[in-house]
Structure formats: structure tokens, C-alpha cells
């Protein structure tokens, strides 16, 4: 039976009748006035500014209100640490003086202190009783551990020492071969004056020589100029501004330790702020600059990524110690406007980079960009003028921030809608003067005339890009899209649409045809968007992967291996077409861009060709060369292939429409059921259907679509299973292109040779490639 634990006496001390001299404590509190309290100033959000004359706000806690008996002044009862120091000192001196007075003689012989000590002694005895059992248990455990350690030491001594055969004249040839395999010669970067650390990183990343935009921009940025850079997509604009930022970091913050103190964190400010129009581009910029930092020695730059869909609290913590900030305008403005002191930090940045500037600065988009730019240029009025502040202001005036602007299109006419009526600009590109006036109205440059760099003033498209046009009926775009996929079986394809609903439908349609399709649009959760991009761009992904996306993937995404771009819808603006097509043929690689054009879209396509290729067409016509490059080549698909594929597409569309209609119907029923529950009425789906049928929308706009959706959603499970079985049977066969299946040896075609050829295994027969 275990020993019963001794009980500790709770109240062993009794109050002494003799008044003792006791030190004054702040537990009881002091009665003070409102001006004697130690008020603390409340930090207001940066966005509040002066709030129409609001000067400030102070607060205090742990204070009780003491109301006077008559009409006297209201007092406050506060602890000693809530009172101002000079007031607290005077109160403590008065208290000690009063406590030191003689209080008379008591009849009690034993003082209270002795009783307290005796109670403590009893407590320590109880502790000793408990610790003896604990010590016995600990000693047993320790002895077991010691025995195990002794056995392990004996076993280690018994084992013979490993023998190493040391050979004379060790060669480092294997090490040299490994280094040569990982790194490349970067002597082409020497004229730009880049540091050895960054050259090491460029060598590991296999960037042997700079691109034209990098050669032109890096020296100007390093010398302190504002730069506006225009270059075609995939020309390396990220490194054009990333390398000078890291060079500044090496010169000023190379040996700077990581700050942990609040005062040090509050005094630190970021070096650069990089704005991006989309989350995917912001993540890509962060990935590229991080790779440049991690592969370079002595560069420990901390990069903060501020995008929507992720935790705000985590981003605020990372921002406190960041050197480079990359973000989208919406989330960046939310963090700055609700934070304390963040706006003052960002006003001290050295580099402001606006990537894809024509999109960020376009009219009617990204209102937060204007607010951010206005906040960065705002000067505080209410501050104390001291010598330190004056010196800081002088330093800020001596070294204001550099503004760096990059994009592939600066032509304002390219942002006009292609469809509809209206007056259109000519297709010529903006010259240097017009582009500078367009940007000077939006941005506050440090220099009167920033340096404008245009490495391809004539053509906006990549040199190795092939552009094609497929004319098809509007209701058969799915058929022609699937046919193009069959012509390019081992090509990584990016399909662009103008709506989110089209992305959802096409993704399900292609998946029903056993094609590895992924979706990407702005309504997806951020983790789902990142997952789609990662699966599509992974080196281990299927080489036939298809990404169906809206224009969120049109700008800045640098995914290696994209061979084909298909425009399912004609883009709304010409600059969108330029950036869509720029996802392929990047960094001297080749690629194709094919536009599916319906008869009602021919006007928009003609305007598109006039805007994008006007300068190149004019230059080619004025040249003496006989060959003239057409803007968009017409692509002719084999009609036999389209006829053979049509049954597959029809079955896949029926299955897809049924799934989408059923999903839409269930969501509508859920909404009506929840609304009926809120109103307290019974929900009957058949009654609602009868009422809707009575109203009738057969001839109105959308009536036919609703009828088709209802018919597609009313299919039974058996009918859907039958359609899937038929489609599965068709997909299991090759598309026959002129081979007799009944008499295999009667024709002039050698079927065995066709099966042995390792070409396009989708077709059975000779099918020509799409060459344009």
C-alpha cells in the first residue's frame, strides 16, 4: 500500500496583535489624479493619417474609478507601475515615513515572522519526504542507462577499426568533371561589372551570357538611373532588375545579422518593392530571385511574398525582417494600410519595380496601385523637428528610390477591345516620346526623363514563334480543339479561354477524352492554383499535359517546355494576345500559337493582326527581300480526321454537359432549400419546377440553353454509363486513316510497317504534320 501523502496546513500564521513595520506594496493601489497616471500612446494605422484633426489616442489598463462622496474631483485607484515615476516615488516616501512610526506594545510573545518560518519548515519536510521516493526511482533509471552505455563501449572496442587504402597521388579529375557538369562559363557577364558572388550563382543556374535587355539595363540601373525596359516575352527581364538589387544588397547589407529585437526590426526597412499583377507571377518572381540568392555565397537576403489566398499574419511576420518584398497590389495595400509603421518603412525603399506595367497601370484596373504609389510619395506633416529627423530627411533627399518599369507592351492602343464598334487607333507602336509621356503621368520618377530601353522596337512577338489561324464554326470549337491535340501528342499545351465557365467545361471535356488536363482560374483557391501550376510544370509530369486557363496565366509565367499555345477564344485585347503567345518560344526556344476563329470573330482577328503585326508587315514590305512573312498563317486540318473524331467528341460533350448540369441543379436546389429554411416554409422542387414552367422562357434569351441544360441533367445513371462505355470503346481504338480493317492483306498499305513505326500512335495510317 502506498504511503499517504502528507497534507500541508493552509493557514499556519496568525495575525499578530503588534503592529509590525511592513514594506509598502503596490497591490492595494494608490489614489491618484488623471494627470498622474502613466498613459501609453496607441499606435494608429498608417492609413488613418490625421483623421480630420484627430491628434492622438492614449490608453491605460488596470485602473479602478474612485467616485468622490460630494462634488469633488474623480480619482483613480492604480497599481504602482501604472503611476508616473515621480508621483510613485513621492507616494512611496510618504508611505515609508508613516510605516516607521511606533505603534505600541502587544501582549503576544512570539512574533508573526517566527510563525511564518515554522510553517515554511513544515513545508520543506514534506518536500523531503516526496523527494526520497523520486531519488530512488531516478537512481534505478540512471543505473540502467549506465549499464547500456558500458555494454555499447565494450562492443565498440571489440570491433576492428576500418582499413582505408590510401593511394599516393590522389587525382581531382572526378571533382573537376562534376563541377564542369553543374556550372557554365560566365565570362560573357564580365563587361557588366557583376560581382563574383552573383557570377557564381549565374554559373550554377547555367546562364552563360546576358540577353540584350540585361546588357542594356543592368549598367544603367547600377549607375542609379530610372529605367523603362521593353522587350519581348521570355527575354530575361526578371534578372535585368534582380541582379542590380542584389548588387546593392552586397554593398550595403552583406554582413548585417538577422535582427531579433523589436527596436532593431522597427528601424530596418526593405531595399526593394516589386509589384506584380497576378499571384502566379509573384510566386515566380520570388522563386527566381530566391534561386539567385541561394546559389550565391554571402547573400542572405530575406524575401517576403505578399499575395492573396495565404495567411496575413505569417506574411506580416516575414515582412518585419525582409530585404526584398514581392507582392500583388491588393494584399500589399491591405498589409500596409492596417499595419503600424509599415508605410514609413516602405517610404525608405531604394528600388520600386513595376513588372508588367501596362497591366498594372491600365485605366480601371488595380486601384490599390494608385493608393500605394500615392502613399509612398506622401510626406508626413505632424512630426517633431529635431536634428536627427532633419539629417534623415536630408539623407532621404540625397538618395531617393529608383523606379524600374518593365513590360513587353507599352502601346495604349493594344489595350483597346477588339470586338464591337468604335474608333480604333492605328497599329503603329508607340515611339519613345509617347511611351514616356504615358508613364510619366502615372509614376513619379526621380529623373525628369528616365532611360527608355527598347531592344525590339519593330516586332513584339518572339522570333522563333510560329502563329497559325484555324477557321471553324462557333459550335464546333471543341471538335477542332481535340483534333489539334491529336496532331500534337507529346506536346505540353496551354489553352486560353475568356471565361471561368469555359475553363471548367473544357477541363472536364478533355479529361473525359483521357487527356491529362488541368484547370487554372481566379476563382480557385490559392493552394489549388499553385498545385495546378506545379503539376503542369514539373519535370516528371506527363509530356502531353494540358493546362486550361484564363488570362491569369497570360503574363509572366515562365514554364519550361510549353510547345503549343491554343487560343480557344479570340482575346479581348491585342496586348493579351502578345502575352498569351509569349508563354512559348521563350529564351531562343521555338513554339507555336494557334488561334481558333469563328465567323463572327473574324473582325476581331483582323484588328488583332493589324495592331500586333502592322510594324513588322510595313518593314517587310519596304525591304528588298522577295519573301514576305504573313502575320497569321492559315492552318488546314484534314477533313477525314475531323470526320473520324466527331463521334468521340459528341459522346464526351454529352457526358460533360450532364455532369455540369447536374452540379448546377444541385447547387440551385441547395440555395432554394436554404432560402426556404430561412423563411420557414416547405421546399418542394417539383412545385418550383411547375411554377418556372408556367412562366415560360422558351423564346427569350437563354431559354434554349436552359432547355438543353434541363435535358442533359435529366439523364439517368444507366444512360450515362452507356455513353461512357461507348466512349471507352472508341478511345481504345486507333483512328483509321484509309486502312481496310476487314481485308488486312488486300490493300497496298503495309499495316505491319505502320504499327512498327514509333510516330503518332493515335492514327492508323498516313497523316501529315501541321507545318506552318
UniProtKB/Swiss-Prot annotation:
Q: Which family does it belong to?
A: Belongs to the DEAD box helicase family. DDX24/MAK5 subfamily.
Enzyme class name: hydrolase
- GO terms, molecular function: ATP binding; ATP hydrolysis activity; RNA binding; RNA helicase activity
InterPro entries, A to Z? DEAD/DEAH_box_helicase_dom, Helicase_ATP-bd, Helicase_C-like, P-loop_NTPase, RNA-helicase_DEAD-box_CS, RNA_helicase_DEAD_Q_motif
**Where is it located?**
Nucleus, Nucleolus
Alphabetically sorted, this entry's keywords are: ATP-binding, Helicase, Hydrolase, Nucleotide-binding, Nucleus, Ribosome biogenesis, RNA-binding, rRNA processing
Species whose genome carries this gene: Ajellomyces capsulatus (strain NAm1 / WU24) (Darling's disease fungus)
Gene from which this protein is expressed: MAK5
Q: What is known of its domains?
A: The Q motif is unique to and characteristic of the DEAD box family of RNA helicases and controls ATP binding and hydrolysis.
- The entry's ATP-binding residues are 231-238
Q: Which PANTHER family match?
A: RNA HELICASE
Q: Does the keyword Metal-binding apply?
A: no
GO annotations of cellular component type: nucleolus
Q: Residues in domain Helicase C-terminal? A: 480-638
Taxonomy-wise, where does this protein's organism fall, top ranks first?
A: Eukaryota, Fungi, Dikarya, Ascomycota, Pezizomycotina
Ranges for region Disordered: 1-27, 88-146, 690-715
- Give the protein name, as stated in the record: ATP-dependent RNA helicase MAK5
